[in-house]
Amino acid sequence: HVRFLYAKGSVYRIENNNLLFHGAVPLDENGEFARVEYGGETFSGRAWMDKCERMARQGYFAPVGSDARRRGRDFLYYLWCGPLSPIFGRDRMASFEHLFVDGEFPERKNPYYAYIENEDEAVARGTARRIFAEFGLDFETGHIVNGHIPVRAASGEQPVKAGGKLIVIDGGFCKAYHQRTGIAGYTLVSSSRGLSLRSHGPFESTQKAILDNLDILSTKDVFEPSGKRVYVEDTDAAVRISCSFQRDPRRTPLRLRKRFRASGRIRNRPFRSPQQIPRPSNPPRLRSS
């Protein structure tokens, strides 16, 4: 499972001029990119998220027993609950207090959320514009796709914010959030005709679904139709397919690939043991003449 996460996941992803990430791009109280000092260097914005990506991969792929692997593993704990972690997005984790101590123990969110979700659309869009510029994306056609903070749909909160530039797709898939959110999560669908959101009703139990003939109900909301139909040749996938014909990564020396993987500069494919490789149920047999 961990190898699959490293092979398919990342701290952030850019796809078809959309910026996808789980938590936040850490900001300071003034709405500027938070400056983080680590290892004698100062990082902010995209550079900080790239550093987090490299350290996370270093903690898993660096040689066993090496200082690089130890530092990377320590850094994974910071990503989990650090105040300027782009995955955590809060000033502290108060899970222990919530579980064992009566009272309120607020976890203050990073200023990113106050700016990007600001009721003043000019402030929210201005923040989105700076983030798009930081990642080299076009503001007019792009979106930020965010998770982490459940959308309280039952209270009228909308998942599309900042004048359509921010899409929050965490609708509370976890059962513990259903009462708070009123739904069981969102699915963002990007098709050739535009973007749409599907909100899902909670699934109570298999027994109730069978006895009452219930299904998971989903509602669809097309919020940004495409001006013209998008074809495969217009996507980032087409660029990757084109590049694969021009160069074969398998020709990269094995020694160099292992070094890049250990430092977190390239992703590792998910491991599949021989038992996991699908085989035909009735393999053809060779006849001897």
Indicate where each model-derived feature is located:
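Feature recognizes metal-dependent phosphohydrolase scaffolds
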Residues: 1-289
